[in-house]
């Protein structure tokens, strides 16, 4: 039977469902740390810089192990690679809850740094290996939507994390001292990863042709004329390192991550300082408003992730222009994101308007996510896991730098300037303004990178020409 004569099955969307579920788990596990940070910071008595190093430990490990875990997926397949790394990071998620401060000792703090680093090591492989699975299961003109859906799911879960954490937290009072209990949240979130691995093991296959329920028409649709490779994978590192496209993609993602990391690191603490917190009673208007404000940038981002993925694929299907199909939405998204940051400077004394502008910035940033990750598949092809790993590696180095630099800038303003008789709150506001200028400027550079990036030029031809 001619495979094109029958209607393709839709088993590939089951892969998308698993990928979306995993994306949600990754965000629950990482965002919950930023959500509880105001309470952890008080319990461990940390400065802004010390808090920043905890965020940086995760981001640096996430960056350092993107390429190795992407290579593992390209070499051994997404099925077994994802099972191993999800179990790894789930263990360290739970272990976070078992570390307690010790008076006069810095050991618990350094142990937290190590655990956050090892947690990031595991999570580093999630999205490169999702990209690997999508390369096997989706034709290139559906990948933008698929990646957008994955990011939508993750951002949505991240946006709901504050609600979940606040609902799970409880208080006790001993000798008149109130204690917020947050540790059990990490045990619960760690368990979700184990459950996901069990179902993934039984359902997923790296080769669509070997999966029950996939017909020949769907296999033909997925392959899309791409030549199958049976040879041993040899990574063309020379071509990768010489690729202008790859360096532009990495530079763009570095700048975007530098600005975006605010949403899962310092923003919850800023809101608490401004009086936007959950209060002592659950399910009140104050509780819901605090959760909404903490998660708003990620919630609106979840919508734009899906929208951006749909738009980039729609543009390519309608025009056949892969270059502008990816570039256009990158330029628009990051340009408007930078604009929101610069405007937010004028609303520092209005926390409600400030958070809405930061949320709009997140919306425009996430409009680019489908195009960015689909571009990894466009130019990487059979090396898509490695290309995605390279992009996310450099991007999270931007996040790591943001964790260190943001905290240092805030501490310098509230320390050095106050020592010179400056008002503490005014000095802290100046520190925030300085950081906002840096975040907005980073997005301007990201726009420049998008203007030079061309997704229609693969690093190595795979027998499938991407038309413009």
Predicted stretch roles:
Residues 14-48, 263-268:
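Extracytoplasmic
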Residues 31, 59-67, 124, 159, ...:
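Residue-level signature of mid-helix packing/kink "hotspots" within the transmembrane helices
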Residues 33-37, 241-309, 364-373, 377, ...:
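Extracytoplasmic gate region of multi-pass secondary transporters
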Residues 87-105, 331-349:
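C-terminal ends and interior cores of transmembrane alpha-helices
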Residues 92, 106-125, 254, 340, ...:
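Hydrophobic core of transmembrane alpha-helices in multi-pass small-molecule transporters
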Residues 115-152:
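Cytoplasmic helix-loop-helix junction between adjacent transmembrane helices
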Residues 144-170, 193, 301-305, 392-403:
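Glycine-rich segments within core transmembrane alpha-helices of 12-TM secondary carriers
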Residues 154-204, 208-209:
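Helix-loop-helix hairpin linking two adjacent transmembrane segments in secondary transporters
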């Amino acid at each position: 039977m001619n495979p094109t004569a029958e209607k393709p099955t839709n088993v590939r969307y089951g892969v998308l469902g698993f990928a979306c579920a995993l994306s949600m788990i990754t965000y629950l596990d990482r965002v919950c740390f930023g959500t509880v940070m105001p309470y952890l910071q008080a319990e461990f008595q940390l400065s802004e810089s010390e808090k920043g190093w905890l965020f940086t430990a995760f981001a640096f490990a996430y960056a350092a192990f993107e390429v190795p875990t992407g290579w593992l997926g390209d070499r051994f397949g997404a099925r077994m690679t994802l099972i191993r790394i999800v179990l790894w990071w789930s263990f360290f998620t739970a272990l976070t809850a078992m570390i307690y401060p010790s008076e006069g000792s810095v050991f618990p703090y350094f142990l937290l740094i190590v655990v956050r680093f090892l947690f990031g090591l595991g999570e580093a492989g999630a999205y490169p290996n999702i990209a690997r699975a999508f390369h096997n299961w989706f034709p290139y003109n559906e990948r933008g939507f698929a990646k957008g859906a994955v990011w939508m799911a993750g951002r949505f879960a991240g946006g709901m994390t504050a609600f979940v954490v606040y609902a799970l937290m409880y208080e006790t009072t001993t000798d008149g001292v109130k204690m917020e209990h947050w540790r059990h949240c990490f045990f619960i979130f760690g368990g979700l990863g184990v459950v996901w691995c069990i179902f993934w093991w039984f359902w997923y296959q790296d080769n669509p042709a070997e999966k029950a329920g996939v017909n020949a028409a769907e296999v033909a649709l997925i392959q899309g004329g791409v030549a199958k490779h049976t040879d041993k994978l040899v990574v063309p590192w020379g071509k990768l390192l010489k690729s202008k496209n790859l360096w532009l993609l990495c530079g763009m993602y570095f700048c975007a991550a530098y600005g975006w990391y605010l949403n899962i690191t310092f923003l919850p603490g800023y809101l608490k300082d401004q009086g936007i917190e959950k209060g002592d009673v659950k399910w009140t208007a104050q509780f819901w408003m605090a959760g909404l404000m903490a998660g708003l940038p990620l919630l609106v981002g979840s919508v734009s992730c899906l929208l951006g993925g749909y738009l980039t694929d729609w543009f390519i299907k309608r025009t056949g222009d892969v270059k502008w199909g990816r570039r256009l939405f990158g330029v628009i998204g990051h340009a408007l994101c930078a604009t929101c940051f610069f405007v937010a400077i004028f609303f520092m004394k209005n926390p409600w308007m400030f958070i809405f502008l930061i949320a709009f910035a997140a919306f425009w940033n996430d409009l680019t996510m489908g195009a960015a990750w689909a571009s990894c598949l466009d130019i990487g092809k059979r090396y898509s896991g490695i290309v995605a790993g390279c992009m996310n590696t450099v991007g999270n180095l931007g996040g790591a730098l943001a964790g260190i630099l943001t905290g240092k800038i805030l501490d310098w303003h509230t320390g050095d300037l106050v020592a010179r008789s400056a008002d503490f709150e005014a000095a802290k506001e100046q520190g925030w303004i300085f950081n906002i200028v840096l975040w907005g400027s980073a997005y301007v550079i990201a726009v420049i990178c998008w203007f030079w990036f061309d997704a229609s030029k693969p690093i190595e031809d795979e027998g499938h020409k991407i038309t413009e």
